[in-house]
Amino acid sequence: MDRLVDRDISASMFTATSHDPLPTHVRTVVVGGGIIGASIAYHLSAAGENDTLLLESNVLGSGTSWHAAGLVTGARGTTTMTKLAKYGLDFYSRLEQMSGLDVSFQRCGSLSVARTAGRVDELLYAKDVADQQGVRTEWLTEDRYKELWPLATYSGVAGALLLPDDGHINPGHATVALAKLAHSLGTQIRENVAVHKVLRQGDLVVGVLTDQGIVHCDRVILACGLWTRDLAATAGVKVPLYAAEHIHVRSAEIDGAVPELPVYRDLDNSYYIRHEAGRLLVGAFEPDGLPRPVEEIPSNGFAEFGPEWEHFAPIRAKAEGVVPALASAGFDRFLNAPESFTPDANFAVGETSELSNLFVAAGFNSQGIIFAPGIGKELAEWVISGTPGFDSSAVDVQRFSGHQNNRNYLKARTKEGLGRLYAMHWPNLQMETGRNVRRTPLHARLAELGACFGEVNGGERANWYGAPGTSPTYDYSYGRPNWFDRVAEEHKAAREGVVLFDLSPFAKFEVAGPDALEVCQMAATADIDVETDKAVYTLFLNDRAGIELDGTITRLGLDRFLVVTPSFTQQKTAAYLKRIARGKAAAVFDCTAALATIGVMGPKSRELLSRISPEDWSDEAQRYTHGRMVEIADGYAYSLRVSFVGELGYELYPSADMAVNVLDALWEAGQDLGLKLAGYHALDSLRSEKGFRHLGHDIGPIDDPYSAGLRFTISMDKPGGFLGKDALLKLDPTAPDHRTVYVALEDPDPVFVHDETVYCNGLPVGRMTSGSYGHTLGRAVGIAALEPDADLSGDFEVQCKGRLYPAKVSRRPFYDPKGERLRG
């Protein structure tokens, strides 16, 4: 594993320019000369943005790129990630020809091994997604496995998946090749220039302070790996990531270690193996990682830690058990170097919430080589156009909560994060470290009543309930998990009786001031100039008419509005509203922590509320989508008659200090009504049956309202327009780029995850964007995006873990298509 210390292949490229004075102004500064920064610089220049300066504090590739194993693949676990990975794999196959440099790209394939039934399910699911996106796959027989990897035993193998077009590349050489391409298209590159600070004026970046002076610019892109967090902090921006040790060892020479060996991923044993010059390289993604604070990592390039043979011993023993030649050959090199990890094991990409012209691309969780080309391309487009051209929901840096940037929290989470790459990616998987940091006002009481909590972006929420007095835990499955029956009971109670949801994690903002209406009108596609206490469901678009957010806006008064959006969009919602409010006589207040939210849902919700409140709860007193302040329990709360479950329901907004009082009163009063507590898994099941969209799955920044089937949210004629209207006017509402439909399997046994391929008359025509088990319908149900010309009268099937299941497809939800139950 050669370091690029001698710089042979780059010396002729940059000698002529590396000693020139820094420019005083450029359009774009990219900070970080690793493979991510080089890819961004190349893709910017390839798109015509050649007034770009790439700054590297040492030499190109000397941060973390140099020591990466260089594994590349065309498949990941979701459609979006597979598209990004596939682009990267195709790009690397052309990089040598494009750049004229040897990047040692070896297309040897990759072999992923399953040793448990659950892992077999995961690989079959991944195979379905790969097949859907045109990535070649092969499910291996024992004989084929032995043919491809004669050095490995077959003992304990439950299944194996081959991706024949995968391979590996020299990451240092690839970094320099990308930089050469960028340089040839006009990008300026400076090595040995340290950036000390990102400079800002108000809410905008204006330049960077380096050890060689100030460079003024119109925008900055931070792609400096594990140093991104601290550099962003110089401008008051939070980018949560933390370093951990990543270990690989190299064997002595082994007979049979040939270049044709596929990359071997033993996922259940937490290691990979690849060929290297007649030897085998073994790398670990152990479940008990070793976090390292950035202060302990040298900033002068090519940082390494000392050997950790004792820590590596369990992985080594497993690898030697599978490949006995490793034990007999021994190892002649131990490499231990830093990688950076985020709290949820997805990378941090995009425009920051704090500064509208500061972008980041960091925290790649040991997948930077795989995703560098794809993210370079997509972020370049994002920077140029101002909006993402891909579904960025899972990687958008704005998804994180502010407290997740805390170093104590990050250190605890990173110990787990390293191993998450090879750990099981179960549906609804919950992180285990860094928990119980951010809780709702009802958390303790719900724990007493049997809640099993999950976490979204650092916040705890009740996902399902065991019996009161128990401490339920997760037992995951790609089929029916251990909470399936409990959620079925919660679901039934919501449909037939009454349930309580703790919806306090919802992001909540008050917009107030003389220009508050103007701000909300510009933010929302719907007309918000409505009567006081009227709630409106709306979309929030970007400049391309893509859906950035969805939620409700309730008019509280002449110049006061309550905006409620999904919990994971708290930072994004704040940024969206504040940017529109900039320069206007309106303030945006985050009241998420100040207000609890209790969902009282089900046909008996009206009866329950009347027992603890003297108010009139009739339909005439509070109509659907209307709110009011009510006297309830021993205090007051704002009551909003809306429901995400498809039944009569109310959202109560007591102040945080009164929330437990309201919950206790409801719980005590509802026992003879069969009242149950319900969690977010039941909420997902209920909304799937009703066909309500889920932001981040069914709708996102590349989906316009027409394609999403949400045309009813648009008010083209309201005064002043709205953000994204100009782009929306250019679209033909009768010719969307895809068709959103509702899907239900005929077989009652399978369970949807998402991204399953949908077939019509034997041909693939789309994919499931989200799904759950519809306990009222007694089958898996969800939402799909189909090709616009798909024949809805055809015979439909959905592929689940390699098997096709007959399905029904409809333009209208299968449950209560007219929405009569909502209106009570």
Curated annotation (Swiss-Prot):
Its EC number is 1.5.3.19. It is an enzyme of class 1 (oxidoreductase). Pathway: Alkaloid degradation; nicotine degradation. Catalyzes the oxidative demethylation of 4-methylaminobutanoate produced from the pyrrolidine ring of nicotine. To a much lesser extent, can also use sarcosine as substrate, but is not active against dimethylglycine, methylaminopropionitrile, methylaminopropylamine, and alpha-methylaminobutanoate. It catalyses: 4-(methylamino)butanoate + O2 + H2O = 4-aminobutanoate + formaldehyde + H2O2. Belongs to the GcvT family. One of its GO terms (molecular function) is 4-methylaminobutyrate oxidase (demethylating) activity. This is 4-methylaminobutanoate oxidase (formaldehyde-forming). It holds the Pfam family GCV_T_C. The keyword Ribonucleoprotein does not apply. Induction: Is transcribed only in the presence of nicotine under the control of the transcriptional activator PmfR. Forms part of an operon with purU, folD, nepA and nepB. It comes from Paenarthrobacter nicotinovorans (Arthrobacter nicotinovorans).
